[in-house]
Amino acid sequence: MLKAVLETTIGSKSKRDLKDYLPTLRNINKLERWALLLADEDFSKETEKLKDELKSGNSLENILERAFTLSREAARRRLKERPYDVQIIAGLALHKGKIIEMKTGEGKTLSSVQAAYLNSLTGDGVIIVTVNDYLAERDSNWMKPVFDLLGVSVGVVLSNMDYELRKAQYAKDITYVTNNELGFDYLRDNMRYDLNEKSLRKFNYCIIDEIDSILIDEARTPLIISGPTEGNTNAYLEVNSLVSFLKECSKDPKTGDYPLEIDDLDGDYTVDEKAKRISFTAKGLNNLEQLLVSKGIISGSMYTDSNFNYVHYMTQALKAHLLFLKNREYIVGDSGVEIVDEFTGRVLTGRRYSDGLHQAIEAKEGVRVANENKTMATITFQNLFRMFDKISGMTGTADTEAKEFHKIYNLDVVVVPTNRLLARIDEDDTIYYTEEFKFNAITDEVYKTYKKGQPVLVGTVSIEKSEILSAMFKNRGIKHEVLNAKNHSREAFIIAEAGAKHAVTIATNMAGRGTDIKLGGNIEHRVRKKIGTNVSLEEFQEAVKNERENYLKDYNEVKSLGGLYVIGSERHESRRIDNQLRGRSGRQGDPGRSRFYVSLEDDLMRLFAGDNLRSLMGKLGMATGEPITHSLLTKSLINAQKRVEDRNFEIRKHLLEYDDVITKQRDFIYAQRNSILEDTAIKDRILVALEEYLSFLLEGTKSSTVSNVFLNEVNSIFAYMLESLGSIENISSLDLKAKLMQIAKANLDEKENLIGRDLFNGFLRYEYLKNIDFKFQEHLANLDSLREAVYLRSYANKNPITEYKEEGFSIFSELIKDIKVSTIRRVLQLKLDSNSSDFKSTKKSRNVKPIHKELSGIVINENKSASNVQVVRSSPKIGRNEPCYCGSGKKYKNCHGKS
């Protein structure tokens, strides 16, 4: 209430920001006459002047008005488009580190030019992030003539580029790149074994296009670089055949809920559709064990080390059958099971679900089951973009998520007014009792509109629903196009003609499509279709000019019919995604219309709407197929979406709390790697680490005594070198430490003299980095296990995140110690042959291919190159099952054989 009163009296934060930009806008408009008088060759000279001013201590704010004026005039000259005042305001907001909400067709791409140009003048680089390669390449090519005139370089990073080309592109003043490629390049850079192989420079300023898609929709999507691991792929085939033998617990037919008392659960497992979780009952675990034994899959107890993984395999198999459906979450294509993006409807080529879920789906679908992967490096988009000194973003829909943007990223949303008033009519939702009634009504409405000639865009949430509607349209004789993950190769053509007269298009989610639907069709696409692509730019422009009269005739005819009619076949979980679909109509002041059709069988209503709605709607007569609008129903629909949005926000916030623990540890590890990469005296670093560790072992002991723990650890580190130590009777701990340091130094000096200082430093660097990477990979797996463990502690009234932070810190402290000790042990015990002269500072270029994590992560396979160092053993190889040489009593494979 107070917020509403304040906004009425002093305006919202967004409106106050807009008002603050007006004086600057007026000054930019006044300077326009100055820019009009400049010759083309003067623009790069003016750019150099602005750069010199910054080097002399001037600020970006003091040169802002001139920079914006120059870039506006450059756009007018090269693109024949003069940015409107609202686009200049949007550019100002982007420079200030805000998120701008601009409606579809209002020119977000051009609005980013001014902010990108201004911030590029510092020389620290600007990154413009897009959601796919097509948009990155399109936008960079589109804006390149503007930046060329201004004298600033522009580059683009695409998924098929090698690291050398990437490095060159990132070195440009302004670089276009997708969020995925940027994240992977950051992870890859921090797995390099040579500083010169790094492609990125310091994160300075970035502009994120479709920022809501990247920082909200994909916030739960960890980027993962992984390597192959030995997995029991046959197990997924074995348990897949057992799914039908297990039974879901019964639900209350009235509420649709399971009994609250555990003893009342009568089945083997429960299903949580909202959280996509399967939980076994005690009875279910007993039945699973009996099944596994009776089918000869295991022998003995299911709870032994060798058998307990079958609980995980079975859980994933049930998920695959009950929660992940073909043509909804994935399709089966030529390359096997392919994930479909929930928000865009596109196939996520090469990505795989993690934790064995993808293998379970492959077993379900009868395709080849691939090996699992282990995580080598990971980061979320939340923490990737928080590393930039300044970030801003743009989208057509951000205001509904303003609270989350502010709380998580400290970013404010500025709603930029349209250049022309919005003429689209947004109709009230039409609500039906069943999905069948709803689809019949949509078909009737589309048929009527199609006969009139008005173009229609029908949005669906899955491939399955798009194919149902397509079949119904075909039966009614409605000529139409279908845009979904199965035919995404025709996307450009389908979207180009979606605004033409009589066009009917069924699209599976329009979020992130990045292409405007123009009334009357797309003139450029129409011309390309007529004259082909092998023509000069001048010929193409002439053909466009000749076609314009016909195009304007079609445009005006479609406009008179009411513009594009958008029909939503159901409500999405997020109001923002619904708004994105609506926003395809009514661009730049064009007329348009939108309406959503909803049924009680839609996932949103079924999972999140109130329990009494179905009986109420039956009483209102809807069971007969009649639609209804009612304030209670509308309110329930809005509340259902808000509940989902709030729940998803809490999930993302919770994820960030866990991820912050990993982030701090990853930052420390990567800082250590960088320090080692730059270090020209790693031998000294290793000796310092050894002295610190020996001192740690001696803490609390008397100087005259040496503990057995100390001796055992010394034995494990120095091994055969202790022969030169002689008797240690009657030697103090401090004297022993000094002698050990002498032995270590002599050992390393001898190796350094053998192959040379630079070569030896490279060898030590390689061993240190290899150890860090290997141990950190194990640590990430341990953190995953810890997270699963602390989740269960909530049942004991313990705070899982507190437990995770405390234990995570403890195992990280052990990791740091283990890295140092295992590196010291290895470099001391290895002998370098005098023929090792071919060893060079080891480079580890990685050939990676993007793969996906369960809720949506991306996994990359890593191919490790072998080192050229020749290693000669000083003693016979120890068998994996023999006692470890350190005296711990463990088998070698479970002790020092791990490293």
Curated annotation (Swiss-Prot):
Binding residues annotated for ATP, in chain numbering: Q87, G105, E106, G107, K108, T109, D516
Enzyme Commission number(s) from the entry: 7.4.2.8
Topology term for the membrane: Peripheral membrane protein
Gene3D superfamilies for the chain: Helical scaffold and wing domains of SecA, P-loop containing nucleotide triphosphate hydrolases, SecA, preprotein cross-linking domain
Subcellular location as annotated: Cell inner membrane; Cytoplasm
UniProt cross-references to InterPro entries, sorted A to Z: Helicase_ATP-bd, Helicase_C-like, P-loop_NTPase, SEC_C_motif, SecA, SecA_CS, SecA_DEAD, SecA_motor_DEAD
Positions bound to Zn(2+): C884, C886, C895, H896
SUPFAM superfamilies noted in UniProt: Helical scaffold and wing domains of SecA, P-loop containing nucleoside triphosphate hydrolases, Pre-protein crosslinking domain of SecA
Induction line: Part of the secA-sod operon.
PROSITE patterns: SECA, SECA_MOTOR_DEAD
Subunit structure, as described in the record: Monomer and homodimer. Part of the essential Sec protein translocation apparatus which comprises SecA, SecYEG and auxiliary proteins SecDF. Other proteins may also be involved.
Record's keyword terms, sorted: ATP-binding, Cell inner membrane, Cell membrane, Cytoplasm, Membrane, Metal-binding, Nucleotide-binding, Protein transport, Translocase, Translocation, Transport, Zinc
Protein name in the entry: Protein translocase subunit SecA
Principal subcellular localisation of the protein: membrane
Organism in which the protein naturally occurs: Borreliella burgdorferi (strain ATCC 35210 / DSM 4680 / CIP 102532 / B31) (Borrelia burgdorferi)
Gene Ontology CC annotations of this record: cell envelope Sec protein transport complex; cytosol; plasma membrane
Gene that produces this protein: secA
Catalyzed chemical reaction(s): ATP + H2O + cellular proteinSide 1 = ADP + phosphate + cellular proteinSide 2
Pfam families: P-loop_SecA (PF21090), SEC-C (PF02810), SecA_DEAD (PF07517), SecA_PP_bind (PF01043), SecA_SW (PF07516)
Entry annotated with the keyword Translocase: yes
HAMAP family per record: SecA
Role of this protein: Part of the Sec protein translocase complex. Interacts with the SecYEG preprotein conducting channel. Has a central role in coupling the hydrolysis of ATP to the transfer of proteins into and across the cell membrane, serving as an ATP-driven molecular motor driving the stepwise translocation of polypeptide chains across the membrane.
Co-factor: note: May bind 1 zinc ion per subunit.
